């Protein structure tokens, strides 16, 4: 099969910044408490009238420009999100229309914080098998719109943003080398938004009970995350015929400093190889990894031939990792 790699990246976050000091005025918390437990100092918040499709569109423009690809050349658009503009139509359809990707197929994919990894793994198969040539994968979220701003256990954690990647055939032996994806529905209730679906359709009661906001069993999710991040990264590396010593760059889901630090320690990887930006953005769910990827690529942390691992976990419960031999050459 054809080797498939990332040939362009882009990201976008809203202008408005919400700091920990701002949160002190909203809920019973303080900057020191938030930083010591999460590592987060600030996050970006979309305006009430701004849908996730706008963030996805802006990230997509930047990724296409980086890849030197015109929108009409796209064959496939995948949007990973838990905060779509609508239940239907898919946000991918809205973004593709605005871009002018007239010949592209497209759909939304929902795997919470693991969504971008599921997205690139899916898109890569369409290209590897020769069905498509150019794919755009976007992870975007407006989590601020589904937060209970009175719940200090969750409202301090999340932010809004979008990241995108363009996938194409690349030279043999480069690009995606291995994946590991998984899920465990038994843990679905640990991280969920219960209202609005066919189980609990929207009603005055579901709104009053704040069922349209993120509900999280923090300690249970923490224990799961620390264990699974290391396991899935090692499995993906094994499938690629590599070990942790071969890794030049690790891009973990930016959920919480303590989770990232614990996973890094378990893996035994040099902390200097790990990309961390959650202090500036918080947890952006499906946007977390692609925004960090874009920053790593643009800052020179990824060089031609580097072995890069993206790894994450999320609601579902879901998890995943992808191993990439970086195929993009510097300008």
From Swiss-Prot:
Intracellular or extracellular location(s): Cytoplasm
Identification of the protein by name: Beta-ketoacyl-[acyl-carrier-protein] synthase III
GO MF: 3-oxoacyl-[acyl-carrier-protein] synthase activity; beta-ketoacyl-acyl-carrier-protein synthase III activity
Organism from which the protein derives: Desulfitobacterium hafniense (strain DSM 10664 / DCB-2)
Pfam families named in the record: ACP_syn_III, ACP_syn_III_C
Record text on subunit structure and interactions: Homodimer.
Domain writeup: The last Arg residue of the ACP-binding site is essential for the weak association between ACP/AcpP and FabH.
Gene3D superfamilies (UniProt xref): 3.40.47.10
